[in-house]
Amino acid sequence: MLTITSYFGFLLAALTITSVLFIGLNKIRLI
């Protein structure tokens, strides 16, 4: 149970970081 929770937490963190980087790159390109 703990392994599944930590895995989903890591997946969520990775997805958040990726989306933030993607949005940042798009904003830089727009400017």
Swiss-Prot record:
Keywords: Chloroplast, Electron transport, Membrane, Photosynthesis, Plastid, Thylakoid, Transmembrane, Transmembrane helix, Transport. The keyword Nucleotidyltransferase does not apply. GO terms for biological process: photosynthesis. Component of the cytochrome b6-f complex, which mediates electron transfer between photosystem II (PSII) and photosystem I (PSI), cyclic electron flow around PSI, and state transitions. PetL is important for photoautotrophic growth as well as for electron transfer efficiency and stability of the cytochrome b6-f complex. The 4 large subunits of the cytochrome b6-f complex are cytochrome b6, subunit IV (17 kDa polypeptide, PetD), cytochrome f and the Rieske protein, while the 4 small subunits are PetG, PetL, PetM and PetN. The complex functions as a dimer. It comes from Nandina domestica. GO terms for cellular component: chloroplast thylakoid membrane; cytochrome b6f complex. It is found in: Plastid, Chloroplast thylakoid membrane. PANTHER family: CYTOCHROME B6-F COMPLEX SUBUNIT 6. This is Cytochrome b6-f complex subunit 6. The keyword GTP-binding does not apply. It is a single-pass membrane protein. GO terms for molecular function: electron transporter, transferring electrons within cytochrome b6/f complex of photosystem II activity. The gene is petL. InterPro entries: Cyt_b6/f_cplx_su6. Its main location: plastid. Belongs to the PetL family. It comes from the Eukaryota. Disulfide bonds: none annotated. The chain crosses the membrane at residues 4-24.
